[in-house]
Swiss-Prot record:
Protein name as catalogued: Discoidin-1 subunit B/C
UniProt xrefs under InterPro entries: FA58C, Galactose-bd-like_sf, Galactose-binding_lectin, H-type_lectin_dom_sf, H-type_lectin_domain
Native organism: Dictyostelium discoideum
Role of this protein: Galactose- and N-acetylgalactosamine-binding lectin. May play a role in cell-substratum adhesion rather than in cell-cell adhesion. May be necessary for the maintenance of normal elongate morphology during aggregation.
Pfam families given in the database record: F5_F8_type_C, H_lectin
MF (Gene Ontology): carbohydrate binding; N-acetylgalactosamine binding; oligosaccharide binding; polysaccharide binding
Tissue specificity note: Stalk cells.
Amino acid sequence: MSTQGLVQLISNAQCHLRTSTNYNDVHTQFNAVLNYKNKGTNTIDGSEAWCSSIVDTNQYIVAGCEVPRTFMCVALQGRGDHDQWVTSYKIRYSLDNVTWSEYRNGAAITGVTDRNTVVNHFFDTPIRARSIAIHPLTWNNHISLRCEFYTQPVQSSVTQVGADIYTGDNCALNTGSGKREVVVPVKFQFEFATLPKVALNFDQIDCTDATNQTRIGVQPRNITTKGFDCVFYTWNANKVYSLRADYIATALE
């Protein structure tokens, strides 16, 4: 399995981190980023890992998000500047930050065996949560780790609305018979990042028919991220003087 296409939650500052304890103020969650290096030039950058001050199975590091995320994988790494790493751990998570669940009923997950090798664990099924925590169970010399959580990208709904798409007066639908159409190009106010869905509704209808049956339609055609063609149409003996429509375009980005 691959992390390609997934979001690195911690590295991209998409969450808040909190720890149970810190060895001191240069062994904190700040140092827990995967592949973190202190550059070896001074002590200000601190340890190449988060290190707990208490060494027992009650320690943890938790990532909390503003909105629910879909967690796919957790990555673990040891301390880069000492022979300290977590050899097994469990995962706990919560969707509402009130009720917590244990992944695999709290079963141990294999950790790492050296300072710098990154070990990924892909969850059996995606975990939907606001907060997720690593709880070390066993360790080499000290509880020290660097880590990352991989999630699905968060998509949000982006909507644009437009009005007054007009065929013009006495348009081409007002003459002839059979299937006829008028195409009006529409440009969005700004370009979507992904292809939107477009819905149209009539705002004004001006037409007649000797049989008292009004046959008209409107639909989008040739939709792109920049715009679409608004197609007004009629058929049979309908005479359409003019039509006007509004649109709603929505995309997940």
